Amino acid sequence: MTYKGKFHPTNLNKYKGDINNIVYRSLWERKFMVYCDDNDDIVEWGSEELVVPYISPLDGKRHRYFPDFYIKTKNGDKFMVEIKPKKYTKPPRPTKTKRLTKAFMHETTEWARNRAKWSAAQDVCKKHGWKFLIITEDHLKMTKYLYGG
């Protein structure tokens, strides 16, 4: 099941972007928004506010990637953040039930597209002295214990 909705921050001055159109596309993204809004170490954040051009390995054409988040911390560090289920952060592997099925082919093309996006994001971050992070549910579960989310 996909969860989608609008987020309404309590710390309006921290959000960089359209405060009336902060959309989350999963409960993990919503959880990260709460974390950014409530965490005193994060002084600035945005959701899908950055654009990273990349070349898709699927069609060889230039496309635009909108990373899930941008954050800036108190000490000046800047991060580009992608929230992804852990299973989508690794190459798909065929199993006895998942040989060259339609689902496996879809996972393979998505993996190739994501690798191209993430490589382009890492290049942009390196150029600007930022860090690129892929955050999974494992990381977000930890925030429950650290920040009560």
Label the predicted regions:
Residues 1-149:
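Electrostatic, structured charged patches in enzyme active sites and in nucleic-acid/phosphate-binding
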